Amino acid sequence: MASKEFHIVAETGIHARPATLLVQTASKFTSEITLEYKGKSVNLKSIMGVMSLGVGQGADVTISAEGADADDAIATIAETMTKEGLAE
């Protein structure tokens, strides 16, 4: 299992466009990938799940992956979040 914490810096938080991008990125992997915020954990491959968290600017979230490609999944998601200016 691999996981990484992120601090959301995007002014609008994880709204529709970045949520869609994260779901598309996560869906490329076979691992089970979750997004945790305020004690609630959702499937990062589910747009409805991600949107239901209402993650805003300044939030701290944890993304975890379990499976054969877990390390690659976390690395790719981290790269996407940083590149898109979503998190640091």
UniProtKB/Swiss-Prot annotation:
<dbReference type="Pfam" id="PF00381">
    <property type="entry name" value="PTS-HPr"/>
</dbReference>
<keyword id="KW-0963">Cytoplasm</keyword>
<dbReference type="InterPro" id="IPR001020">
    <property type="entry name" value="PTS_HPr_His_P_site"/>
</dbReference>
<comment type="function">
    <text>General (non sugar-specific) component of the phosphoenolpyruvate-dependent sugar phosphotransferase system (sugar PTS). This major carbohydrate active-transport system catalyzes the phosphorylation of incoming sugar substrates concomitantly with their translocation across the cell membrane. The phosphoryl group from phosphoenolpyruvate (PEP) is transferred to the phosphoryl carrier protein HPr by enzyme I. Phospho-HPr then transfers it to the PTS EIIA domain.</text>
</comment>
<dbReference type="GO" id="GO:0009401">
    <property type="term" value="P:phosphoenolpyruvate-dependent sugar phosphotransferase system"/>
</dbReference>
<comment type="function">
    <text>P-Ser-HPr interacts with the catabolite control protein A (CcpA), forming a complex that binds to DNA at the catabolite response elements cre, operator sites preceding a large number of catabolite-regulated genes. Thus, P-Ser-HPr is a corepressor in carbon catabolite repression (CCR), a mechanism that allows bacteria to coordinate and optimize the utilization of available carbon sources. P-Ser-HPr also plays a role in inducer exclusion, in which it probably interacts with several non-PTS permeases and inhibits their transport activity.</text>
</comment>
<keyword id="KW-0805">Transcription regulation</keyword>
<comment type="similarity">
    <text>Belongs to the HPr family.</text>
</comment>
<dbReference type="GO" id="GO:0005737">
    <property type="term" value="C:cytoplasm"/>
</dbReference>
<feature type="domain" description="HPr">
    <location>
        <begin position="1"/>
        <end position="88"/>
    </location>
</feature>
<keyword id="KW-0813">Transport</keyword>
<protein>
    <recommendedName>
        <fullName>Phosphocarrier protein HPr</fullName>
    </recommendedName>
</protein>
<feature type="modified residue" description="Phosphoserine; by HPrK/P">
    <location>
        <position position="46"/>
    </location>
</feature>
<dbReference type="InterPro" id="IPR002114">
    <property type="entry name" value="PTS_HPr_Ser_P_site"/>
</dbReference>
<keyword id="KW-0598">Phosphotransferase system</keyword>
<keyword id="KW-0762">Sugar transport</keyword>
<dbReference type="InterPro" id="IPR050399">
    <property type="entry name" value="HPr"/>
</dbReference>
<dbReference type="InterPro" id="IPR035895">
    <property type="entry name" value="HPr-like_sf"/>
</dbReference>
<keyword id="KW-0597">Phosphoprotein</keyword>
<keyword id="KW-0804">Transcription</keyword>
<feature type="active site" description="Pros-phosphohistidine intermediate">
    <location>
        <position position="15"/>
    </location>
</feature>
<dbReference type="InterPro" id="IPR000032">
    <property type="entry name" value="HPr-like"/>
</dbReference>
